[in-house]
Swiss-Prot record:
InterPro entries named in the record: Ribosomal_uL14, Ribosomal_uL14_CS, Ribosomal_uL14_sf
Organism the protein comes from: Canis lupus familiaris
Subcellular location: Cytoplasm
Family in the record: Belongs to the universal ribosomal protein uL14 family.
Protein name, UniProt field: Large ribosomal subunit protein uL14
Keywords: Cytoplasm, Phosphoprotein, Ribonucleoprotein, Ribosomal protein
Length: 140
């Protein structure tokens, strides 16, 4: 991996269907005090004219907190998407989707700001982000 790689992620990222464009509001699944996250950009996307950058499971995004503790609001935080409603295909051929879109707030190195995650974490995300996998209750 190059010097300017993905923060604290490890391993190769496979192509999955991107279900969360810029402007999407996702649930915050950690115990930082944030209720939801508003995606303002996606890390590592070069882009095409008039195309909205979109994120999928395991992507790092820049997000703001729309509902939650006042200390967290009106600031830009890095976050990692851990669940998405849009179905995506795994290498073994199974299609998988979750009942909500969710992310967790991290720092630039990929270490979680909170200490617990509510709900399952996608296996693709857990493989990429070991610091998130260690705090996950269940990995699906």
């Amino acid at each position: 991996m190059s010097k300017r790689g993905r923060g604290g992620s490890s391993g190769a990222k496979f192509r999955i269907s991107l279900g969360l464009p810029v402007g999407a509001v996702i649930n915050c699944a950690d115990n930082t005090g944030a209720k939801n996250l508003y995606i303002i950009s996606v890390k590592g996307i070069k882009g095409r004219l008039n195309r909205l950058p979109a994120a999928g499971v395991g992507d790092m995004v820049m997000a703001t907190v729309k509902k939650g503790k006042p200390x967290l609001r009106k600031k830009v935080h890095p976050a990692v998407v851990i669940r998405q409603r849009k179905s995506y295909r795994r290498k073994d051929g199974v299609f998988l989707y979750f009942e909500d879109n969710a992310g967790v707030i991290v720092n630039n190195k990929g270490e979680m700001k909170g200490s617990a995650i509510t709900g399952p974490v996608x296996k693709e995300c857990a493989d990429l982000w070991p610091x998130i996998a260690s705090n996950a209750g269940s990995i699906a």
